[in-house]
């Protein structure tokens, strides 16, 4: 699942994920709230991997994590959550490390090489 308020980023990242053959189905949501509503109402297909933008209006990535961690465990589906950012702001990296549900923190844009590294790290 891609959670990002930028439709352009979602379009580009979905293309990179498909090029890397990580999955056949990429679910995109334009806000944290929209993603939570989807996760609460849909048990299948569950997301194995969530790319979560940090800076979004309304509900940012950190606020999404607070709500996500309160979901029933079966709705969380043990997804690998990777935080996405456009900056190398050290405080964001430090904050990401404080969340046990966050597996990784990377700077946009996603590339085919990054997708290969993610596949090797989490799915092999």
Question: Model-found features: residue ranges?
Answer:
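Conserved acidic segment of CheY-like receiver
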Residues: 1-8, 13-17
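Helix N-cap/capping motif at the beta->alpha junctions
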Residues: 28-37, 61
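Active-site beta3 strand of CheY-like receiver
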Residues: 44-51
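Receiver (REC) domain active-site loop signature in two-component systems and cognate sites
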Residues: 56
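Alpha4 helix (beta4-alpha4-beta5 surface) of REC/receiver domains from two-component response regulators
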Residues: 63, 77-79, 87-104, 117
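A Lys-centered signature of the CheY-like receiver
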Residues: 107-108
């Amino acid at each position: 699942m891609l959670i990002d308020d930028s439709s352009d980023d979602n379009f580009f990242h979905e293309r990179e994920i498909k090029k890397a053959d990580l999955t056949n189905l990429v679910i995109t949501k334009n806000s944290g709230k929209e993603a939570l509503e989807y996760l609460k109402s849909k048990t299948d297909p569950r997301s194995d991997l969530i790319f979560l933008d940090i800076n979004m209006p309304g509900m940012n990535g950190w606020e999404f994590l607070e709500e996500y961690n309160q979901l029933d465990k079966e709705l969380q589906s043990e997804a690998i959550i990777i935080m996405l950012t456009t900056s190398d702001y050290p405080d964001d990296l430090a904050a990401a490390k404080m969340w046990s549900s966050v597996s990784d923190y990377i700077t946009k844009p996603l590339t085919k090489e990054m997708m290969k590294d993610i596949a090797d790290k989490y799915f092999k």
